């Protein structure tokens, strides 16, 4: 298998004006809810001018989600909004009337009583759920797949969760959490969907939309827009949410989107490759350093969005993520340094690797049509959520599959 394998999506449809769940009012409601959270700030959209010159393109932007609410990752956006929506249903109130200050009030706690939220996670989503539950004075239970980082486990426990590492891969840890939720009448807050469980995953995806809302607002101020967007995918919830907004906002002028996954958990790539319009799973240990992308079963909601609107999927060796981590950690000239973790850096790693090795990917590079007018957008979805691992990769060149 090559360091990067690519496949073109042959099932793309023409956009007809709406993507269910991502209408203008829904997205506005999400952003307003997040703006009510303590210490809300837009995360930086960093213009890497020197890297753009090096790669022969007009612009390279990287959105740095390590700055999100002090949690070092973007996932709290989905966890917080979905829990807010859960509570709005329980309280029979529109979420617009339940900003954070109201949700965390003694009056609301009295109405709700004691609740427990449960989820499975590689780290970032579980930490976001635990953070929100703690602020609501509610309980959270978090299951992690085997091989998860002790540092990520401790970060979740520090948010007050009953968190533990299981003997299962990610997808089976999700099934375990779902069983426990049913047995104990807990609320399952999972960032992937399956038949019969779609409402909360959609709310989580809507929560992620704040990232792209912030990006588009900032780019509109300087009258710029991306031509190519590299989006990492695990189950596809993040990528699907970003794709939905790109398609909704830009319509016929939407950028080319490239979905990036690890070789060991490339379910979107394999689904594109099958070319039958259906999601296809990847079984086994899902071995990769990209822990946040180590998922083998596509989210059924996001799959339909990616199938209908995303242009390409890449299956990447772990060295591609490592490349991205190092590129962002050791910037050119006056470019700003970005601390990007294993799951955050694969997009920029893929782009730079393709540029530097375009002779090995002539057909793909030609299809991408990247030139000196191209504007590249990547989203670094996490910082150094496992500081020891990050340092070992960036300083020493060590990583598990090396």
Question: What do these predicted regions represent?
Answer:
Residues 1-402:
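PLP-dependent amino-acid enzyme catalytic core
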């Amino acid at each position: 298998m090559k360091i990067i394998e690519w496949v073109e999506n042959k099932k793309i449809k023409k956009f007809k004006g709406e993507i269910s769940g991502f209408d203008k009012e829904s997205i506005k409601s999400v952003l307003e809810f997040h703006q009510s959270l303590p210490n809300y700030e837009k995360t930086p959209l960093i213009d890497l001018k020197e890297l753009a010159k090096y790669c022969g393109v007009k612009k390279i932007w990287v959105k740095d989600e390590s700055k999100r609410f002090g949690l070092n990752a973007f996932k709290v956006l989905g966890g917080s909004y979905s829990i807010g929506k859960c509570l709005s249903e329980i309280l029979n109130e529109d979420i617009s009337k339940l900003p954070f200050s109201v949700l965390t009030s003694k009056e609301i706690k009295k109405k709700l009583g004691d609740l427990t939220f449960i989820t499975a996670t590689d780290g970032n989503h579980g930490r976001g759920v635990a953070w929100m539950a703690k602020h609501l004075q509610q309980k959270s239970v978090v299951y992690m797949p085997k091989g998860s980082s002790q540092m990520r486990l401790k970060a979740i426990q520090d948010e007050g969760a009953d968190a533990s590492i299981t003997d299962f891969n990610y997808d089976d840890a999700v099934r375990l959490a779902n069983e426990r939720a049913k047995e104990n009448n807990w609320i399952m807050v999972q960032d992937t969907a399956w038949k019969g469980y779609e409402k909360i995953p959609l709310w989580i995806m809507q929560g992620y939309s704040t990232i792209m809302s912030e990006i588009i607002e900032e780019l509109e101020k300087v009258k710029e827009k991306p031509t190519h967007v590299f989006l990492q995918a695990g189950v596809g919830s993040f990528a699907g949410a970003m794709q939905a907004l790109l398609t909704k906002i830009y319509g016929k002028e939407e950028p080319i989107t490239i979905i990036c996954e690890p070789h060991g958990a490339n379910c979107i790539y394999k689904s594109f490759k099958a070319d039958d319009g259906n999601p296809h799973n990847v079984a086994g240990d899902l071995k990769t350093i990209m822990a946040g992308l180590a998922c083998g079963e596509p989210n059924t909601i996001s799959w339909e969005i990616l199938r209908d609107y995303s242009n390409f999927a890449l299956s990447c060796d772990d060295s591609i993520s490592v490349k991205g981590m190092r590129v962002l950690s050791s910037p050119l000239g006056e470019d700003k340094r970005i601390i990007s973790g294993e799951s955050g850096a694969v997009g920029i790693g893929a782009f730079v690797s393709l540029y530097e090795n375009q002779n090995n990917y002539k057909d793909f590079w030609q299809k991408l049509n990247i030139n000196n007018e191209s504007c590249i957008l990547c989203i670094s979805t996490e910082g150094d959520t496992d500081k020891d691992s990050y340092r070992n990769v960036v300083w020493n060149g060590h990583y598990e599959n090396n």
